[in-house]
C-alpha cells in the first residue's frame, strides 16, 4: 500500500481552495488538467510510496517519536505558484508559509526518525505547498498559469496540532486516503517550549 505522513487542513482552507479551483476551471475551461480533489489535499511531510503492511508500525512509531519534540504551532496557507515556471507550467500550487521555522523543523525531524527506522531519506529540499492541478498538455497551460498567478490568495492561518499517517488506495473514483494513525503535538498552553521549538528557530533560515 502507498503511505504518507501529512498535516490535515481545516475546512475553511478547503473551502477557499475549492473556490479558487472552481474559478480557474470556469475562467479557463479548455485546458487539459488533472484537478486535485479538495478533500484529498493535505500538506505532505513525507511520502513513502509502496510499503509492506509490517512496516506500518515503524512509520507510526517514527511519527510518534517526532511529535514528542514539538508543541502546536501556526503556519499560513496563501499565495500562488507554479512548477517549474509560468511559461512551461506543469503543476499549479498554493503556497505554505512557515514564519516560525517549526514546519521545516518538524519535517526534518520526521525525515531523520524515518531514516533511523530504515526508510530512505528524501534528497530533495522540502518545499511545502498544496498541489491543486497537474497540466497534462502544453496547450493553454501558459494561459491557465497566468490566470492562477493573477488571483490573490490571501494568507490563511492554520494551527498544526497533529501529524497523520495515511494510506492511499486507488479506485475507479480516484485515490482514497484513509488515516492509519494520529500523532498529537503538545498544547503550548499546558507545557513549556520543547526541544523542537528552540531548534526550529535556530535553523529556520535554511528552509
Give the role of each language-model region.
Residues 1-190, 195, 199, 205-207:
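Histidine-dependent nucleotide/RNA phosphoesterase domain, centered on the 2H-phosphoesterase fold
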Amino acid at each position: 500500500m502507498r503511505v504518507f505522513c501529512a498535516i490535515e487542513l481545516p475546512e475553511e482552507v478547503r473551502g477557499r481552495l475549492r473556490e479558487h479551483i472552481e474559478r480557474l476551471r470556469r475562467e479557463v475551461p479548455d485546458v487539459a488538467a488533472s484537478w486535485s480533489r479538495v478533500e484529498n489535499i493535505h500538506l505532505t511531510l513525507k511520502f513513502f510510496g509502496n510499503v509492506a503492511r509490517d512496516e506500518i508500525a515503524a512509520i507510526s512509531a517514527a511519527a510518534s517519536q517526532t511529535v514528542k519534540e514539538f508543541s502546536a504551532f501556526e503556519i499560513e496557507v496563501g499565495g500562488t505558484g507554479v512548477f517549474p515556471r509560468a511559461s512551461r507550467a506543469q503543476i499549479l500550487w498554493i503556497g505554505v508559509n512557515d514564519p516560525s521555522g517549526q514546519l521545516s523543523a518538524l519535517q526534518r525531524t520526521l525525515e531523520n526518525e524515518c531514516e533511523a527506522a530504515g526508510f530512505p531519506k528524501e534528497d530533495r529540499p522540502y518545499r511545502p505547498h498544496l498541489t491543486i492541478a497537474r497540466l497534462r498538455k502544453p496547450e493553454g497551460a501558459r494561459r491557465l498559469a497566468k490566470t492562477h498567478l493573477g488571483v490573490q490568495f490571501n494568507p490563511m492561518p492554520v494551527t498544526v496540532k497533529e501529524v497523520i499517517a495515511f494510506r492511499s488506495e486507488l479506485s475507479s473514483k480516484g485515490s482514497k486516503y484513509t488515516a492509519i494513525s494520529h500523532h498529537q503535538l503538545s498544547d503550548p498552553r499546558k507545557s513549556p517550549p520543547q526541544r523542537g521549538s528552540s531548534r526550529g528557530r535556530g535553523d529556520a533560515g535554511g528552509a
